[in-house]
Amino acid sequence: MESQQLSQHSPISHGSACASVTSKEVHTNQDPLDVSASKIQEYDKASTKANSQQTTTPASSAVPENPHHASPQTAQSHSPQNGPYPQQCMMTQNQANPSDWSFYGRPSMIPYTPYQMSPMYFPPGPHSQFPQYPSSVGTPLSTPSPESGNTFTDSSSADSDMTSTKKYVRPPPMLTSPNDFLNWVKTYIKFLQNSNLGGIIPTVNGKPVRQITDDELTFLYNTFQIFAPSQFLPTWVKDILSVDYTDIMKILSKSIEKMQSDTQEANDIVTLANLQYNGSTPADAFETKVTNIIDRLNNNGIHINNKVACQLIMRGLSGEYKFLRYTRHRHLNMTVAELFLDIHAIYEEQQGSRNSKPNYRRNPSDEKNDSRSYTNTTKPKVIARNPQKTNNSKSKTARAHNVSTSNNSPSTDNDSISKSTTEPIQLNNKHDLHLRPETY
């Protein structure tokens, strides 16, 4: 009796259970031979209905929602969602397909992980050439890179180079302002050098030392995204990424050029503020130097107006050009070209006066002889003697005798001798007398 009662109630209970099933398959342990044919048909209809309901259900509703991948976008969006950094995966070069998501300007569309969350890139091979970060879970980006001795696999190598395979490379800081981008690039380049990737950094001519590989480009692309958020990038960087969102090498090359340009700007400002000119160099060369500096500064966004430029130029003038400070200081609308017209006029006048002066140069040996012969600065007295003295050389006694004999002759000559000594004495040269000029 009990077995018959169980067999009578079991189909009813089984049928009620089957009516509430909504899964793909109906599982039962009861022998289908114990069920009547009408009940079997009912079971088949219920199973068919359940299958038809499942086919119309969206695939997303059958998958439980992951709370870690919650996205602010709508459910109809089929693009990758923006989730927290620790829950997303590193992007590979093959995944960076423009047809899947947009360029780097929308980083929320590109999944990647922070540098601390995944091992650092190293090329395939038996020995790793690059240090690796430990894959710790939940490490925020603001957490500094491990630097203590406990994080190293070999504590005895604590004083070795940063590029050792048993040490960790300190990541660059996060970019927080577009104005700090060039300074951030310096730290990012240092980060690449410490990671044994210095060969891919563009040089002064804009080309790297060696060709970058696909894996290195992927690492460069991902690390740049992590530490340089798009909202803090300058406009010129966004313009490059809008054309090719993976061209990080071009960004580094342009950054190095801008760094050199900034250094040149500082040098130009210092040169312009310390100008010196005294006519020792041609005026054309001086004008070319100054105008090139002013043009470079104006092209780089540092505008130097005529008033400031003229003041800097006139402050460096010296010599004959110094008076231009006072003749032109009241001309407020004076231009640099007008100032250089005055400088050219003075320079040409100097050159003309130098060419017109005769150039007499004495023999250096004569100057030495003169300095040795004459020590006194006064000119020595020159005595001119009568050339007939050598032919009529007589003694003083003979000349005195002739004078005494001439006094005995009665002539007008005696009267002339007896005249006052203040009058000039005129003697006839009858007796062959020769007097020195200084005896008068």
UniProtKB/Swiss-Prot annotation:
Quote the InterPro entries the UniProt record gives: TYA (IPR015820)
Biased composition, class Polar residues, residue ranges: 1-23, 48-60, 71-97, 129-152, 419-428
Q: Which UniProt keywords apply?
A: Cytoplasm, Phosphoprotein, RNA-binding, Transposable element
Query: Keyword Transcription regulation, does the record have it?
Result: no
Regions of compositional bias (Basic and acidic residues) in chain numbering: 429-440
According to the UniProt record, where is the region RNA-binding?
Answer: 299-401
Disulphide bonds annotated for this chain are: none
- Location of region: Disordered: 1-97, 129-171, 352-440
Q: What is its main location?
A: cytoplasm
Enumerate the GO terms in the molecular function aspect.
RNA binding
Task: List every position bearing Phosphoserine.
Answer: S416
Reported induction: Ty1-NL2 is a weakly expressed element. Induced under amino acid starvation conditions by GCN4.
- Composition bias, Low complexity: 153-165, 402-418
Q: Please give the Pfam families that the UniProt record associates with this protein.
A: TYA
GO-annotated cellular components: cytoplasm
- Per its database record, what is this protein's job? Capsid protein (CA) is the structural component of the virus-like particle (VLP), forming the shell that encapsulates the retrotransposons dimeric RNA genome. The particles are assembled from trimer-clustered units and there are holes in the capsid shells that allow for the diffusion of macromolecules. CA also has nucleocapsid-like chaperone activity, promoting primer tRNA(i)-Met annealing to the multipartite primer-binding site (PBS), dimerization of Ty1 RNA and initiation of reverse transcription.
Note, other: Retrotransposons are mobile genetic entities that are able to replicate via an RNA intermediate and a reverse transcription step. In contrast to retroviruses, retrotransposons are non-infectious, lack an envelope and remain intracellular. Ty1 retrotransposons belong to the copia elements (pseudoviridae).
Q: What's written under domain? A: The C-terminal RNA-binding region of CA is sufficient for all its nucleocapsid-like chaperone activities.
What name does this protein carry? Answer: Transposon Ty1-NL2 Gag polyprotein
Q: Which organism is it from?
A: Saccharomyces cerevisiae (strain ATCC 204508 / S288c)
